[in-house]
Amino acid sequence: MAPPAGGTAAGSDPGSAAVLLAVHVAVRPLGAGLDVAAQPRRLQLSADPERPGRFRLEMLGAGPGAVILEWPLESVSYTVRGPCQHELQPPPGGPGTLSLHFANPQEAQRWAALVRDATVEGQNGSDSLPPALGPETRPVSPPSPLEVPTPKAPKPKVDLPWSPGDLMEKEELAGRLTRAVEGGDEKGAAQAAAILAQRHVALRVQLQEAYFPPGPIRLQVTVEDAASSAHVSLQVHPHCTIRALQEQVFSEFGFPPAVQRWVIGRCLCVPEHSLAFYGVQRDGDPAFLYLLSAPREAPGRSPQRPQKVDGELGRLFPQSLGLPPTPQPTSSSLPSPLQPGWPCPSCTFINAPSRPGCEMCSTQRPCAWDPLPTASIQQLPKVTRREDGPSLPGPRSLDPLLNLSGNLC
């Protein structure tokens, strides 16, 4: 029987050459459908008697007298895809790229190490052979290639960042991990997670919406900045994250996420957590939003969407305040005197001169700040500017909510 293209038929006597290692694998064409069954094959690495210092890779079929396909080791491309999954790409004209599955991960690791070292030995042209290992021989550490003053061997081929086959395999592994975790298969989940970790696959693991309380619900939000406060109602879902909530407020009202600080249940919220994580489950649950001073834009740049700043709550939410819109200041208005104190480098809050840490975020007072003499400064009472009209229920200061001395989540 004539051998297929890309391989040379050899005698069926494995003892005709020095066999370094032989392993049993399940072989199937790469990218073949699930209906294509894997075929049992025997791979063996042996020294080439006709070319000293060179090696050849042989694939034996099942049964006596089966044709052996063999290739010079330097003509094939061998890639490790996982603990038990390797790929063999014969030279052009052969059977195409083959997927090799090992039953034993230790045997697969030993085989890959020997193929790698034999490839380096062949590229360096060394006459020394790696030690022969039979199927029952205990694995030993392969000898390190000797450093010789020859040009370095070319680096192995690096996989492209994206390819259709690689993407399909990663998605299949992610699906396998999901099904294993959902079904309580700890072993299967560990195997899939190990392969994904070896390939440094970036994943996003989150609970399905079915595990959260039903929505949508109305979230009652008290909004406050350095000048005023207001009450608004937002339609949200309990599975919504704080980051998504920040984007919703940015889209509806123009306050960028960088100036938003959310407090729910006496906890300073983290963008990655969900509303349900902080106890938001039903209509009317309260939340608190404090707006920091808007960050300054870099010179020459303009914001893509309008961004609101301090003092604009009265113009944004006149209905929630029950008041007419705040009148615009006239040119004859005198500027307010500067508030004594030191600005927080983290949240820009103006703190009292005698306060050692920020009242909002507990950041330590800058060492370079030089307070004015206490004799020339009178402690001013802390006030909040309010529009003329009825007082609003709810908190007017962050003090009752942002107890940052130890109650942060």
From Swiss-Prot:
Residues 121-164, 315-337, 384-409 are annotated as: Disordered. This is Sharpin. The keyword Zinc applies. Monomer and homodimer. Component of the LUBAC complex (linear ubiquitin chain assembly complex) which consists of SHARPIN, RBCK1 and RNF31. LUBAC has a MW of approximately 600 kDa suggesting a heteromultimeric assembly of its subunits. Associates with the TNF-R1 signaling complex (TNF-RSC) in a stimulation-dependent manner. Interacts with EYA1, EYA2, SHANK1 and SHANK3 (via ANK repeats). Keywords: Cytoplasm, Metal-binding, Phosphoprotein, Synapse, Ubl conjugation pathway, Zinc, Zinc-finger. Residues 1-178 are annotated as: Self-association. Pathway: Protein modification; protein ubiquitination. Component of the LUBAC complex which conjugates linear polyubiquitin chains in a head-to-tail manner to substrates and plays a key role in NF-kappa-B activation and regulation of inflammation. LUBAC conjugates linear polyubiquitin to IKBKG and RIPK1 and is involved in activation of the canonical NF-kappa-B and the JNK signaling pathways. Linear ubiquitination mediated by the LUBAC complex interferes with TNF-induced cell death and thereby prevents inflammation. The modification Phosphoserine is found at S163, S302. Residues 140-153 have a biased composition (Pro residues). It comes from the Eukaryota. Residues 217-280 form the Ubiquitin-like domain. GO terms for cellular component: cytosol; LUBAC complex; synapse. One of its GO terms (molecular function) is ubiquitin-protein transferase activity. Residues 318-336 have a biased composition (Low complexity). The Ubiquitin-like domain is required for the interaction with RNF31. One of its GO terms (biological process) is regulation of CD40 signaling pathway. It is found in: Cytoplasm, Cytosol; Synapse. Transmembrane segments: none annotated. Residues 173-300 are annotated as: Interaction with SHANK1.
